[in-house]
């Protein structure tokens, strides 16, 4: 005789399903590994595992001179190269110039070139962020359109520095080289043409029914949560908080440029997409203003230790040749001092704490990357959403693991 009660005793209780996501997953933005706990297809918990791209950057910098350390910053967020060079150059300048009894200011032309390429970098980043996000969700066409435009911006990098990505162009005291002939006209033509391309991408995505269904009400973050988690950039401004370092704590004369801080109301994935799209329009406006502000002049400080001798003199004068060699091999000494410098990177607040100790090498360099703070909020943003929405949320955070793992 069949014992029904015994059968029911043997039925096991269903437990939550644990899934390993990445690090090989194409939507993992590099080397992100997530341990996702699911109840059916609903997310209960997301645990990010980081460190797979850790290279010990902060420790490596301690063994390099202030000049030799600069290229490390290109390799943190490798989509926003010049902005990080900008932050490091400002940090070194402030450390060095604070130690002098005289007041020195970076030449005006150098400041304008820095702003110009920082905003070109912001457009580079947002092109990557918005269109790869669209590709992760399933829209391939915007990605193909935008990367055609991104190639043109990479060519501007190459024309000023010789490198498409790791330019080492913005340096303490100014910039490495002056702008080559006709590049200003070409950048201006790009701005005019890219505005039309942006409108085409907006037409494809902004009112797209499927795109909105995948993004609206996904990953809502309140203003209080954004502040508690240390969010900055589009993730903070999406909550309606007006915070942009270019406006709040201007550097390199950003206060002289006319642009708006784009904020949102409902801080969901769709809001953050709109913010990044509108920020590209603002960056194009700043680029135009910078081109109009370009005047003949010096591109770096002269007569100070933090800039290399001009190459024109190196080939004519033995003393300049020796100074040039010693500048790159031995570096320059900065008296004991410390500072914390922040810039508005495309992803948020990028900060550098530098500590000098009367040597030619930093005693300590601490890097604050926005992506590291954003990633810790992924669990909070993912709860009660579907597994497919986790891919959307990784995209809306715009994570790059060079800066997260360092």
UniProtKB/Swiss-Prot annotation:
GO terms for cellular component: mitochondrial inner membrane; respiratory chain complex I. Its EC number is 7.1.1.2. Its main location: mitochondrion. It is found in: Mitochondrion inner membrane. GO terms for molecular function: NAD binding; NADH dehydrogenase (ubiquinone) activity; quinone binding. GO terms for biological process: mitochondrial electron transport, NADH to ubiquinone. It comes from the Eukaryota. It catalyses: a ubiquinone + NADH + 5 H(+)(in) = a ubiquinol + NAD(+) + 4 H(+)(out). Belongs to the complex I 49 kDa subunit family. This is NADH-ubiquinone oxidoreductase 49 kDa subunit. It comes from Dictyostelium discoideum. The gene is nad7.
């Amino acid at each position: 005789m069949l014992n029904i009660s015994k059968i029911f005793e043997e039925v096991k209780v269903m437990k939550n399903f644990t899934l390993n996501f990445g690090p090989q997953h194409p939507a993992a933005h590099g080397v992100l590994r997530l341990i996702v706990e699911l109840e059916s297809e609903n997310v209960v918990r997301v645990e990010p595992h980081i460190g797979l791209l850790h290279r010990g950057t902060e420790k490596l910098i301690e063994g390099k001179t202030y000049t030799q350390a600069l290229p490390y910053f290109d390799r943190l967020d490798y989509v926003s190269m010049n902005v990080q060079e900008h932050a490091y150059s400002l940090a070194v300048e402030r450390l060095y110039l604070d130690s002098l009894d005289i007041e020195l200011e970076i030449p005006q032309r150098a400041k304008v070139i820095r702003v110009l390429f920082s905003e070109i970098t912001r457009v580079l980043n947002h092109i990557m962020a918005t269109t790869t996000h669209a590709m992760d969700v399933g829209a391939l066409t915007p990605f193909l359109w935008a990367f055609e435009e991104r190639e043109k911006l990479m060519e501007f990098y190459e024309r000023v520095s010789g490198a498409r990505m790791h330019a080492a162009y913005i340096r303490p005291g100014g910039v490495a080289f002056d702008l080559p002939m006709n590049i200003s006209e070409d950048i201006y033509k790009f701005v005019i043409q890219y505005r039309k391309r942006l409108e085409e991408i907006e037409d494809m995505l902004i009112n797209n029914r499927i795109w909105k269904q995948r993004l609206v009400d996904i990953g809502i973050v309140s203003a209080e949560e954004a502040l508690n988690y240390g969010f900055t950039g589009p993730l903070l401004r999406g909550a309606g908080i007006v915070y942009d370092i270019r406006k709040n704590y201007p550097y390199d004369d950003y206060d002289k440029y006319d642009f708006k801080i784009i904020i949102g109301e409902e801080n969901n994935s769709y809001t953050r997409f709109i913010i990044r799209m509108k920020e590209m329009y603002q960056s194009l406006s700043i680029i135009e203003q910078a081109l109009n502000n370009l005047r003949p002049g010096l591109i770096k400080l002269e007569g100070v230790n933090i800039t290399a001798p001009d190459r024109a003199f190196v080939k004519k004068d033995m003393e300049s040749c020796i100074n040039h060699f010693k500048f790159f091999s031995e570096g320059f000494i900065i008296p004991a001092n410390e500072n914390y410098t922040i810039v508005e990177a495309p992803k948020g607040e990028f900060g550098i704490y530098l500590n000098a100790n009367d040597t030619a090498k930093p005693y300590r360099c601490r890097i604050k990357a926005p992506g590291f703070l954003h990633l810790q909020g992924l669990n909070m943003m993912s709860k009660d959403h579907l597994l497919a929405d986790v891919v959307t949320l990784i995209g809306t955070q715009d994570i790059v693991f060079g800066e997260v793992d360092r």
